[in-house]
């Protein structure tokens, strides 16, 4: 998997600050069981807000800079807008092709129900990030099932099975409700459950 060594290099000493989910976690679990990995190029990372430190955020930003990433853009009414929760197109090909950030709503903050992003400030640096909000159950489940593999923090295979099954059902329901969900994005989660479970 391209870029795992870079994540370990930059974030290896900060394992309590994050947990990696998705295809990268799947591949590392498969690798630990001597099974064939699925092609993946990205890192989906939950930032653990209870234990997040300025040192971790600074190291994370070093990884983004050294990889030559740029923030992705989304279309808005006023034109394209930079997003600081998804970093893409690294100039150094030894880094993951993109990194996407997730977290949960910080304690004591009241947000409108339709908000799906939260701002993460690094007080010791001018840099800051955003992250896609997860519901508390998903966030806590991933955190409780964090394990170390290849020098980084990922979710274990039991959590992968549960979360992949949930993603399969969710995408299937969205497609049945008329949303534009590609069949590939439904089938891959089902196939991943079979692969990691056996």
Regions found by a protein language model. Give the residues of each.
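Compositionally biased terminal segments of proteins
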Residues: 1-198
């Amino acid at each position: 998997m391209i870029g795992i060594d870079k994540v370990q290099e930059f974030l290896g000493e900060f394992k309590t600050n994050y947990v990696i989910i998705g295809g990268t976690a799947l591949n590392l679990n498969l690798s630990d069981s001597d099974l064939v990995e699925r092609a993946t190029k990205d890192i989906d990372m939950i930032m653990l807000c209870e234990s997040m430190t300025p040192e971790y955020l600074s190291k994370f930003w070093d990884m983004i800079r050294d990889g030559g990433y740029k923030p992705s853009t989304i279309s808005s009414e006023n034109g394209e807008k930079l997003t600081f929760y998804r970093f893409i197109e690294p100039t150094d090909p030894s880094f993951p092709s993109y990194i996407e950030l997730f977290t949960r709503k910080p304690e004591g903050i009241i947000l409108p129900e339709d908000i799906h992003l939260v701002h993460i400030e690094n007080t010791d640096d001018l840099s800051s990030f955003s992250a896609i909000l997860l519901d508390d159950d998903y966030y806590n489940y991933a955190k409780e099932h964090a394990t170390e593999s290849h020098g980084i923090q990922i979710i274990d295979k039991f959590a992968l099975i549960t979360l992949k099954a949930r993603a399969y059902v969710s995408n299937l329901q969205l497609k049945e409700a008329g949303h534009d969900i590609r069949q590939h994005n439904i089938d891959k989660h089902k196939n991943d459950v079979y692969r990691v479970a056996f």
